[in-house]
Amino acid sequence: RICPRILMECSSDSDCLAECICLEQGFCG
């Protein structure tokens, strides 16, 4: 999957860019 390496806080996958998913730590990855 394509995920820009930008540190973004999230509460769900929809908060993240491209194909990033929301990881357990509360950040996109």
UniProtKB/Swiss-Prot annotation:
The record marks 5-6 as: Reactive bond. It is found in: Secreted. This is Trypsin inhibitor 1. PROSITE patterns: SQUASH_INHIBITOR. It comes from Luffa aegyptiaca. Gene3D superfamilies: 4.10.75.20. GO terms for cellular component: extracellular region. Keywords: Disulfide bond, Knottin, Protease inhibitor, Secreted, Serine protease inhibitor. GO terms for molecular function: serine-type endopeptidase inhibitor activity. Inhibits trypsin. CDD domains: PlantTI.
